[in-house]
Amino acid sequence: MKELDLSDPLSMVLKIAELTTRHNVWRLRESINLIASENVMSLTALKAYLSDFMFRYAEGKPFKRYYQGTRYIDELEVLTGELMGSMMGTNLVELRPVSGTIANASVFRVLAEPGDKAVIAPVQAGAHVSHTKFGTLGALGIEQVSMPYDEENMNVDVDKAVKLIEEVKPRFAVLGGSVYIFPHPTREIAEAIHSVGGKLIYDAAHVLGLIMGGAWPNPLERGADAVTGSTHKTFPGPQGGAVFFRDEQLYKKVSKTIFPWWVSNHHLHRIPATAITAVEMKLYGRDYASQVTSNARKLAEALAAEGLKVIGEHLGYTRSHQVVVDVRDLGGGAKCASLLEESNIIVNKNLLPWDPPEAVKDPSGIRIGVQEVTRLGMKHGEMEEIAKLIRKVLIDKEDPKKVAEQVKEFRKQFMKIHYSLDDKDVRIDTIADILSLAQ
C-alpha cells in the first residue's frame, strides 16, 4: 500500500473516497458474493438506516431510558420487536445486542459462571468461534465440552450427545452455528439438557431468515429456551443481533443485563432498517426462503456435476442456504478461496469436521451461501452458470482475470434487489435529504 502524505488532508480524503467507491463497485456490481454470512439490504431499508438515529443514544429499555430524546426510538424498538417476534412465535425479544456474538454472550453469561460447563460442537464441526474456548465462551471462563459429531452426516450424533449431557450435566448446550447444512436435532437435545436442569440455546444467526420464511424448523417450537441470531445473513437486514426467548424468566434475566453489561449505545440506526426488513420478510419471506434453499440444492448438484466434491450428497447436499465443498484435492481452502476471489467470486475457506483446529488458516473446505444472489433474483439457471464459473477456476485452471471479466458481464443482469419494498411507493427521507433541505 502506497504511503499517504499525512500533511495533506485533502489527499487523504480523496484516497478514502477512492477506496470506498472501488469497494462498492467491486462487491455490489462486479462480483458474485457467496459469503454465507452476508446479504444486501433493500434500498428502502437502506433509506431507513441513514437516519439521525446513528448519532443518538438510548440506554436502557424502551420508555425506561436513562437519556431524554428517545420518544421515537422507543416506539420503533417496540414495533420492531413485535414484527420480529411475530415470525418466531414469541413476544419475548431482545434487539439491543449489536451482533450475534454479543447476543450469544448475553445469554451465556446469565446461564453460567466461570468454571461451569457447556456442551457445544467443536468449531471444525460448524460451531461459531463465539461458542469456543478461543472466543466468547473462553473469555467468560466457561468450559467447552465437545458435543459428539457425526462427520458423515454433518450433524450432531444424537445418541452420544444425549449420553454426554447426562454424564456432564452442563449448565447449557448450544446447537446451530456457523457451518451447518442440515437441521440439528433440537427436540432430542432439548429433552436431554432439560432433564439435567440445563438450558438449550440455538444459534440461528445463519438461518434466522429461513426460520421466519418457514424453510427451516423453528427451534422455539422444538424446546430451545433461547434463539440467538444476527440480522444480516439469511435475514437480509442491517448488521446486528437479536435474541428470541421461549422462557420468560430467562428473558427477564438476560434483558436486565444487556445494558450495562454488553451495550451502552445499541446502534439505534439499525432498528428502523431492521423493521423495514421484517416487513419485507412478512410479505415475501416464504418465497424468498424457499428459493434460497432450492438454489442451494441446485448449486450443490451443479457443482457436483462439474466435478467438485460437495459434502452431503447422500442426504441431498443441503437444506440450508449453505453448500460445503471439500477442496483438499484442488489445493486446499485457502488457495481455492483466493483463486475465486481473483475471479470476482467471493467465498470463504472453512474448516471441515476432520480438520484439526490449527488448520484454520488452510482448511480442507470452502463454504458457499446463496442468500445474497437469491435476493438479486438468481434462480436455478444462474446456479448452473455459477457452478461452471467455479469449475473454470478450480478445475480447468483458467486465468482468474479472464473469469473475472465473465463474472462482471454476468452480474450486469442482476442489479435489482428482489423480495423487497423497492417497487412500492414508500417515501423515507434520509438524513442527507433532511440536512439538504436546511441548507
Swiss-Prot record:
Entry binding sites for (6S)-5,6,7,8-tetrahydrofolate: A127, H128, V129
GO biological process, one term: tetrahydrofolate interconversion
Signal sequence region: none
GO MF annotation terms: glycine hydroxymethyltransferase activity; pyridoxal phosphate binding
Site (described: Plays an important role in substrate specificity): H232
Protein's cellular compartments: Cytoplasm
Broad EC category: transferase
Main location: cytoplasm
Listed name of the protein: Serine hydroxymethyltransferase
Record function comment: Catalyzes the reversible interconversion of serine and glycine with a modified folate serving as the one-carbon carrier. Also exhibits a pteridine-independent aldolase activity toward beta-hydroxyamino acids, producing glycine and aldehydes, via a retro-aldol mechanism.
Keywords attached to this entry: Amino-acid biosynthesis, Cytoplasm, One-carbon metabolism, Pyridoxal phosphate, Transferase
GO cellular component: cytoplasm
Cofactor(s) essential for the protein: pyridoxal 5'-phosphate
A family per Pfam: SHMT
Pathways involved: Amino-acid biosynthesis; glycine biosynthesis; glycine from L-serine: step 1/1
Coiled coil: none
Modified residue annotations for N6-(pyridoxal phosphate)lysine: K233
Protein family per UniProt: Belongs to the SHMT family.
The enzyme's E.C. designation: 2.1.2.-
Gene from which the chain derives: glyA
Keyword Cytoplasm set for record: yes
Subunit composition and interactions: Homodimer.
NCBIfam families attached to this UniProt entry: PRK00011.1
